């Protein structure tokens, strides 16, 4: 199957491989179809467009007058998705713009697309970004220390590793990688500078984390650097807050996360409308909860999907429906 195939029609509906391409294999696409779409003639946004797999899945369950807008900061992803969905672009059912989902409100205002009926977030890094050594996301291959999702702008991992002080590096590894060896690794990175490639970075980390902890430690370190380079958690908090403003009452948000830092923020915001996980009351004593989880708790991939796409193993899909502001006083469950 080539990157520009809309889907593999030889694969039955509901099969996790149906919307996969060499660029990226979207996870939980059947669940997204079933739970995000509330109006088949509605307006939907895939704010993490990638190779267009989820956008294709949404278009397949929308009526001819339903539309999907794709947003991505990666120019390669935009080009791939536009080529893949060329027929839908021609029909006016799909279009894509370059941008970050942290600017969701401004993007939608520019496209005259407020309110929307549904918002999809498939967080983290794509398969393509990991698999291309030149992007600098993988510790397994030699590549430049880049890690930018938009390679045309912003801070690189090389600038962080070589330019930040030991204390700042330690804090990054501890906060964004939840790495217990953060202090030791930060000190070793500073001693080994300058570091210019992914393998040079990986070798320093490997010296600090012998087997059996090596791979997990490398994963956490590269995750931490990627998060800070792309301001991923800041962007996530911004898009969740803006979703409350742009999704219509009765519309939905679907967010797929891959690690606890993402999932914790999504869970707390969709359950409580804040990132502290604290029930809050307005001036009249009413509990403020702009979203209602549906269902309560995460949806995870089944065995067949994990077998077909191992990346799905860590995926957590959370879906919530925008409440009417007058209904926001419903009882709230405790945060588990």
From Swiss-Prot:
Keyword Cytoplasm: yes
Major location (coarse): cytoplasm
GO cellular component: cytoplasm
Alphabetical UniProt keywords: Cytoplasm, Methyltransferase, rRNA processing, S-adenosyl-L-methionine, Transferase
GO biological process, one term: rRNA base methylation
SUPFAM superfamilies in UniProt: Putative methyltransferase TM0872, insert domain, S-adenosyl-L-methionine-dependent methyltransferases
A GO MF term: rRNA (cytosine-N4-)-methyltransferase activity
Region of interest called Disordered, as start-end residue ranges on this chain: 294-336
Catalytic function, reaction form: cytidine(1402) in 16S rRNA + S-adenosyl-L-methionine = N(4)-methylcytidine(1402) in 16S rRNA + S-adenosyl-L-homocysteine + H(+)
Cellular localisation: Cytoplasm
UniProt-annotated binding residues for S-adenosyl-L-methionine: 52-54, 72, 101, 122, 129
PANTHER family with a match to the protein in the record: 12S RRNA N4-METHYLCYTIDINE METHYLTRANSFERASE (PTHR11265:SF0), S-ADENOSYL-METHYLTRANSFERASE MRAW (PTHR11265)
HAMAP family: 16SrRNA_methyltr_H (MF_01007)
NCBIfam families, A to Z: 16S rRNA (cytosine(1402)-N(4))-methyltransferase RsmH (TIGR00006)
Function: Specifically methylates the N4 position of cytidine in position 1402 (C1402) of 16S rRNA.
UniProt-recorded name of the protein: Ribosomal RNA small subunit methyltransferase H
Gene source species: Salinibacter ruber (strain DSM 13855 / M31)
């Amino acid at each position: 199957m080539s990157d520009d195939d809309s889907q593999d029609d030889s694969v039955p509906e509901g099969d996790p491989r149906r919307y996969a391409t060499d660029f990226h294999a979207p996870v939980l696409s059947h669940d997204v179809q079933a739970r995000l779409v509330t109006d088949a003639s509605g307006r939907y946004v895939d704010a993490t467009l990638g190779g267009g797999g989820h956008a294709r899945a949404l278009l397949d369950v929308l009526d001819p007058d339903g539309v999907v807008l794709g947003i991505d900061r990666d120019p390669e992803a935009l080009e791939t998705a536009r080529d893949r969905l060329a027929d839908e672009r021609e029909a006016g059912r799909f279009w894509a713009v370059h941008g970050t989902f942290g600017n969701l409100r401004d993007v939608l205002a520019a496209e005259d697309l407020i309110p929307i009926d549904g918002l999809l977030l498939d967080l983290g890094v794509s398969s393509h970004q990991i698999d291309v050594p030149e992007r600098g996301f993988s510790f397994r291959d030699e590549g430049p220390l880049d890690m930018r999702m938009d390679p045309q702008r912003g801070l690189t991992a090389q600038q962080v590793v070589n330019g930040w002080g030991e204390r700042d590096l330690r804090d990054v590894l501890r906060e964004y990688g939840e790495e217990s060896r953060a202090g030791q690794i930060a000190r070793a990175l500073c001693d080994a500078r300058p570091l210019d490639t992914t393998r040079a970075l990986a070798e320093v980390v490997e010296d600090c984390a012998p087997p059996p902890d090596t791979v997990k430690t490398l994963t956490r370190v590269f995750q931490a650097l990627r998060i800070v380079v792309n301001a991923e958690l800041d962007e996530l908090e911004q898009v969740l807050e803006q979703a409350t403003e742009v999704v219509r009452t009765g519309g939905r948000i679907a967010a797929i996360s891959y690690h606890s830092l993402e999932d914790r923020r999504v869970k707390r915001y969709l359950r409580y409308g804040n990132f502290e996980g604290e029930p809050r009351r307005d001036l009249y004593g009413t509990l403020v909860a702009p979203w209602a989880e549906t269902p309560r708790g995460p949806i995870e991939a089944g065995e067949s999907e994990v077998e077909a796409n191992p990346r799905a193993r860590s995926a957590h899909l959370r879906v919530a429906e925008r409440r009417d502001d007058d209904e926001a006083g419903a009882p709230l469950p405790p945060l588990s």
